[in-house]
Amino acid sequence: NWGMDYSDMRALPNMLMEWLEILNRDYNHPSIVCWCPFNETWDYAGRRQDDDMIRTVYRATKQLDGMRPCIDTSGNFHVQTDIFDVHDYEQNVEVFKERYDLLFKTGELFDKYAHRQPYTGEPVFMSEYGGTTIRAKDNAWGYGQPAEDEAQFLKRYEGLTTALLDN
């Protein structure tokens, strides 16, 4: 959906036609285990995603392939989905660990966007996390406070990854 205005239903006919071609082309490919037509449908130029568009594409996907799960939109904002996909770039290992310990222990998922995409017990899939950078002389990109050196980077990466593996 790169470059697509997913807040405007006028984009749906072309997008859906291309998406259905992809599904037909790749349906029998052995490496396809799940479909995901959208990624990070954040508010676009001050306009919210059109939930009906996301729902329509999800339902068309399920109509064509009812066997595989479908993630309606990876990252945000879920409307109708088989798997609750999460992007979490929290850099504080303890905060990150507490979030997913809570999910494992109580079934509650921390989501700062819960008002827009309520979690209703779907399987959770962490498709993006980390994003840690090492402080560099130039303007390196990453989330949160950069690691001061490789050792700090590796310690943080290990902590974030262990928090997921433990849950």
Region locations from a protein language model:
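Substrate-binding/catalytic cleft of secreted carbohydrate-active enzymes
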Residues: 1-167
